[in-house]
Design a protein with these regions (language model features):
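Structural motif
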Residues: 62-64, 183-184, 255, 295, ...
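Extracellular beta-strand scaffolds
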Residues: 66-67, 188
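Extended terminal
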Residues: 22, 239-241, 254, 277-283, ...
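Outer-membrane beta-barrel proteins
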Residues: 17-25, 141-147, 333
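Anion-recognition interface
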Residues: 59
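Small-residue helix/turn framework positions
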Residues: 1-16, 30-42, 65, 79-140, ...
Length: 539
């Protein structure tokens, strides 16, 4: 009583003693009771809990325990009414309990402050949450007065036109309405919930899946969000080949170190501007799921895009580029690597390089720090049919590995096998070293069409980078043409071919050449020597 009742004015009171006056009388032979009628009292139920002030009520101290009947009071800025406080007498060897029931009407912010600050084990779960708006409900508290025992708390409340700001992940809910319950033995639950998120209406329910000492809350929401609004929320500034409205089901699990966010969507209404087979019109749809953890020094990320792609990643909080992960293209599962960087693997039936090159130029061409290249650690692909630069390769294996100052590409296919060295230095030549290149045989039954379109007509020679090319064996059908080597260098007008050394079935073409002009209106030239040994072998 001395610590619980901090102040107050007593309107009236009485002391009652009933029983034996004998000194050696049994305790059961006596009955002592006190009564106070108070106003403007301030009560402190337990350390760590906010005080209840402006209390008007009655206090009964009896053999059975202590009772307080408060008609009204104030907890923070919340009005409380019809509060019944009971501290029943505890038998020998048992702990005393403080039992409180009552109603309240106030603000959502007060409710969050109690969840954050009161000694009930919910501070970390609701840390950083903010709220405003009307809140009304009732509470039922069972607070042990002995140290080391957790209180039992059940609070039922309603909100209407409230605003709730979650801290992790950062999410702003407005026009929040619903029926909620907080149970300290399970967690937060709710039903009939509606709100606005990402400027769109949503419906939601909250499930309490925890147990005493281990609270767990799941928030399940359904709604729609524009791609632009979602990328802003995720703080993605890089343009993406995605547009439209995303229908989603969002699930946030608040479970301490196991807290995570999951977003699933049919993607119906979303247009994906990617080359086949990954692109799709807005009318098609493709089941996709994104998950991420919300706690811990290292955050985990997962994403699945139908049966076409799977992604997993782990990175320190707020340091995505220091992470490690894998993107698997095709029907398979990504595996988290131990080394830093993003690894790409895949098994694809077809891949056309040209549209992917245009896509990279469009969306990554303005990457000032080259962050995508810095993050990539390697790639390993198997492609049934690879098309690019006017050529088709079959049964292709591609491996991309990081070197100190360059990327190393290994190519193995039916038509070509070798390595490509892609230097970091801008303008440095790309080194192409091929063991063999197999060109299709000329069909003698097919007559050349002089009016056939030029396959190089649409190529701008000024866009071709510096290249050092060496081919050990060049075949045309089953016939060996010879070894080829040359150096290609960009010029103001187009390209220069230097150090030409081309084997042509017994002849050797050496010298220099050039290719200049605009697409469709270009010209080429050559200056050099043509040598041969035995003319019979050549013919």
């Amino acid at each position: 009583m001395r610590t619980a009742i901090l102040k107050g004015a007593v309107d009236q009171g009485f002391f009652q003693y009933q029983g034996s006056l004998n000194h050696d009388a049994l305790p059961a032979a006596r009955n002592i009771s006190l009564f106070f009628k108070v106003h403007d009292a301030e009560l402190a139920f337990q350390p760590g809990w906010p005080h209840v002030s402006k209390v008007n009520g009655e206090v009964f101290v009896e053999e059975s325990g202590v009772r307080i009947l408060a008609s009204k009071g104030q907890l923070l800025d919340t009005k409380v009414k019809d509060v019944y406080v009971n501290i029943p007498h505890a038998p020998a060897g048992k702990d005393s309990h403080l039992l409180i029931t009552g109603g309240f009407a106030g603000g959502l912010g007060d409710g969050l402050k109690i969840l954050q600050d009161a000694p009930i084990g919910t501070g970390s779960t609701f840390a950083g949450w903010k709220g405003e708006g009307d809140l009304q409900g009732k509470l039922d508290l069972d607070i042990p007065l002995a140290k080391g025992t957790e209180p039992k708390i059940v609070v039922d409340f309603k909100t209407d036109k409230a605003r709730l700001q979650l801290a992790e992940p950062t999410l702003d809910l407005t026009q929040l309405k619903g029926d909620f319950r907080f149970d300290s033995a399970k967690g937060l639950s709710g039903q009939n919930i509606s709100a606005k998120a990402f400027d769109r209406p949503i419906t939601a329910q909250i499930l309490a899946d925890g147990k005493p000492g281990s609270l767990s809350t799941r928030v399940i929401a359904k709604g729609q969000v524009t791609v632009k609004r979602l990328t802003d929320w995720l703080k993605i500034s890089q343009p993406l080949p995605v547009s439209g409205d995303i229908p989603y089901q969002l699930q946030v699990t608040l479970d301490g170190a196991d807290s995570q966010l999951m977003v699933s969507s049919t993607m119906k209404g979303v247009a994906v501007d990617l080359p086949a087979p990954f692109g799709m019109p807005a009318s098609q749809g493709r089941d996709s799921v994104f998950r991420m953890t919300l706690q811990g020094a290292e955050r985990r990320y997962w994403f699945s895009y139908g049966e076409l792609a799977s992604f997993t990643f782990a990175a320190p909080a707020d340091k995505f580029n220091d992470g490690r992960g894998e993107l698997f293209l095709g029907n398979g599962d990504a595996v988290l690597p131990a080394a830093k960087g993003l690894r790409i693997r895949g098994v694809l039936s077809e891949l056309d390089i040209d549209p992917w090159k245009k896509l990279v130029d469009r969306y990554a061409g303005n990457d000032p720090g080259g962050s995508a290249k810095q993050l990539l650690s390697g790639a390993d692909f198997k492609v049934g049919k690879l098309t690019g630069f006017g050529t088709q390769f079959d049964q292709v294996t591609l491996q991309l590995d990081r070197k100190p100052t360059a990327w190393g590409l290994q190519l193995d296919s039916q038509q070509a096998k070798g390595t490509v060295n892609l230097p970091d230095a801008k303008g440095a030549p790309i080194a192409i070293n091929l063991q063999y290149v197999k060109l299709p045989a000329v069909d003698p039954t097919v007559q050349a069409d002089e009016n056939a379109p030029d396959p190089l007509a649409d190529i701008d020679p000024k866009e071709i980078p510096a290249l050092d090319i060496a081919i050990n064996q060049l075949f045309q059908g089953p016939d060996l043409v010879g070894a080829w080597s040359l150096k290609i260098r960009p010029t103001a007008k187009g390209l220069a071919f230097n150090n030409l050394d081309l084997g042509l079935k017994g002849m050797q073409l050496k010298g220099a050449g050039g290719w200049e002009g605009a697409p469709g209106a270009s010209s080429s030239w050559y200056r050099g020597r043509l040598d041969g040994k035995n003319i019979a072998d050549v013919l």
